[in-house]
Amino acid sequence: MKLHDIDPDNRPRERFLQHGAAALSPAELLALILRSGSQQYNILDTCHHIINRFSLEKLSDVSLKELQQIKGIGESKAMQIVAIFELNRRLHYSRNQLRKIMAAGDVFEYMSGRIPDESKEHLFVLHLNTKNQVIKNELISIGTLNTAVIHPREIFKSAIRESAHSIIVVHNHPSGDVNPSNADKKITNELKQAGAFMQIEMLDHVIMSKTEWYSFRERGLL
C-alpha cells in the first residue's frame, strides 16, 4: 500500500502541508522521505516498525545490513535512511566544528536542544582537543545512570578512538532537579580515576535540566 492509499487526514504529506513538519512523528517524517512501501507492507507501518525496533536515538548508527532485515526495506530505502543521517551529521559538524568550551555554561549552551527525549536520562561525552574545542559529541547511553550500565572503559575507549585530549561528561535529569545522586557522584569519581590512569583528563561532569545545570568542576568536586 502506498501513501496515497491512506486516509487523507492521516497522510503525512497533507499533514505536513497543513500543520508543518513539527506536527509529524519521526515515523511519519521518515515515511514522507521514503514515499512508498511494497505490495505487502504499508510504508507508514514499516517506518513505525523501524523507529520502534531501533529507536530514533540509535537509528543514525544502524547499518545498511540491519535496515534491510526490516520487511519492506530494500537496499535503496536503506541507503536513503543512512544518507539522511550522514547529511545531518555533516550539518551538525559544520555548525559546531571546534566549538570551544571554557565553562559549564558553555556546555549547557552547546547541549541545549540536543537531547532527543528529555523524559529519559541520556549520557553524552564531549571529546575535546588541546584547545578545549569539541571534536565530537557522542551519546553513550539512555536510561538510569548507574555502574551496571556505564563503565569507564566504554567512555575512554571512545576518547582514545577520537584522539581526545580531555573529555566532559554530560547527562540530563528529567525531573528537573540537577543535584547529583549518589550514583552520579560514584561514577564521576570512577571516571576521574580512570582518566588519570589513561592520561585523558575528565574536565567536568555536567548535569542538565531544561533550564539549569550542575557542574562538578565548579562545585570543587573535580
UniProtKB/Swiss-Prot annotation:
GO molecular function: metal ion binding; metallopeptidase activity
Gene3D superfamilies named in the record: 5' to 3' exonuclease, C-terminal subdomain (1.10.150.20), Cytidine Deaminase, domain 2 (3.40.140.10)
Annotated keywords: Hydrolase, Metal-binding, Metalloprotease, Protease, Zinc
UniProt keyword annotation of Metal-binding present: yes
Pfam families from the UniProt entry: RadC, UPF0758_N
Residue window of motif JAMM motif: 171-184
Alphabetized CDD domains for the sequence: MPN_DUF2466
Binding, Zn(2+): 171, 173, 184
Alphabetical GO biological process terms: proteolysis
Record PROSITE patterns: MPN (PS50249), UPF0758 (PS01302)
Keyword Repeat in annotation: no
SUPFAM superfamilies membership: RuvA domain 2-like
Family classification: Belongs to the UPF0758 family.
PANTHER family, alphabetized: DNA REPAIR PROTEIN RADC, UPF0758 PROTEIN YEES-RELATED
NCBIfam families the UniProt entry points to: PRK00024.1 (NF000642), radc (TIGR00608)
Record protein name field: UPF0758 protein Cag_1513
